Amino acid sequence: MATTRMVRVSQDGSGDYCSVQDAIDSVPLGNTCRTVIRLSPGIYRQPVYVPKRKNFITFAGISPEITVLTWNNTASKIEHHQASRVIGTGTFGCGSVIVEGEDFIAENITFENSAPEGSGQAVAIRVTADRCAFYNCRFLGWQDTLYLHHGKQYLKDCYIEGSVDFIFGNSTALLEHCHIHCKSQGFITAQSRKSSQESTGYVFLRCVITGNGQSGYMYLGRPWGPFGRVVLAYTYMDACIRNVGWHNWGNAENERSACFYEYRCFGPGSCSSERVPWSRELMDDEAGHFVHHSFVDPEQDRPWLCLRMGVKTPYSA
């Protein structure tokens, strides 16, 4: 791949561009050069769209607390600089940030949907792209915060908050050392695997799940698709998690096909003996498939994640 290109975004006019979207627009279609868009501290209030074929883009901030991409679209009310025929409608089109370009990286960025509680589906970011990685990022919202729609994604040291189905979609995702915060009652995940032949699913590895101080109000997940697959391994769960753990989305047939697994989790919310009978604890040999990076980086002769982790470009580069 060609030499990395650096551009800087600053809302005060001191950078190469004043808006994140202007910087993205400068990247050519079919891009093969890693383009690092360095975001100066600030709250960037506009919807952001990374189109298909604008690949190898990095968003880099100094700290997620002071570098925020935010907008307030909901599934029922979308204001965007792109037409609905481009970004979609409803939940699919309402993301504050929409990423469709492959090999995307974000570091030290907050992705927020600022629509208030009770607004319905309000996505902070939708990722419809392969080989994407997020490091030390925050994802803020209420319902449907993080839409991991399609492709393979890796999240490390991230903070994700919400209430209803706030990590959802049908990608293959590994979330490692992440903090999952449950703001009010609902469901953490809604994974939508449609067939047992699909390799998709969400793995939470060495994560921490916290709540708002109340007990027993949050489910670990429910199957948006009949074969929804979620694995929690070596993860701390506080008392916000309901003892039963999982929900069938009002359809008993889902209990025959959903794949909801736990492995060596701990904390007051990890009541494995009281879980619904159609979820289960993995055996050691079964867990091996899920607790390694190969879950999202399966091709040993064409690895992407190990290379990605070695070529991260810090903000100061």
Curated annotation (Swiss-Prot):
- Other observations noted: This is the only member of the pectinesterase family that do not contain a transmembrane or a signal peptide.
Member of which family? Belongs to the pectinesterase family.
Q: Does the keyword Metal-binding apply?
A: no
Q: At what residues does the UniProt record annotate the site feature described as Transition state stabilizer?
A: 143
Q: Pathway it belongs to?
A: Glycan metabolism; pectin degradation; 2-dehydro-3-deoxy-D-gluconate from pectin: step 1/5
Instruction: State the protein's purpose.
Output: Acts in the modification of cell walls via demethylesterification of cell wall pectin. Acts in a blockwise manner, resulting in a cell wall rigidification.
What is the protein name stated in its UniProt record? Pectinesterase 31
Kindly state the tissue distribution recorded for this protein.
Answer: Expressed in siliques.
- Active site, per annotation: 144 (proton donor), 165 (nucleophile)
- Enzyme class comes to hydrolase
What UniProt keywords are attached to this protein's entry? Aspartyl esterase, Hydrolase
Any GO MF annotation of the entry: pectinesterase activity
Report the pH profile: Optimum pH is 8.0-8.5.
Tell me what reaction this enzyme catalyses: [(1->4)-alpha-D-galacturonosyl methyl ester](n) + n H2O = [(1->4)-alpha-D-galacturonosyl](n) + n methanol + n H(+)
Temperature and activity: Fully active at 0 or 30 degrees Celsius, inactive at 55 degrees Celsius.
Residues the record lists as binding substrate: 91, 121, 222, 224
Q: Which Gene Ontology BP terms does the record give?
A: cell wall modification; defense response to Gram-negative bacterium; pectin catabolic process; pectin metabolic process
Regulation of protein activity: Does not require salt for activity. Not inhibited by kiwi pectin methylesterase inhibitor (PMEI).
Matching InterPro entries, A to Z? Pectin_lyas_fold (IPR012334), Pectin_lyase_fold/virulence (IPR011050), Pectinesterase_Asp_AS (IPR033131), Pectinesterase_cat (IPR000070)
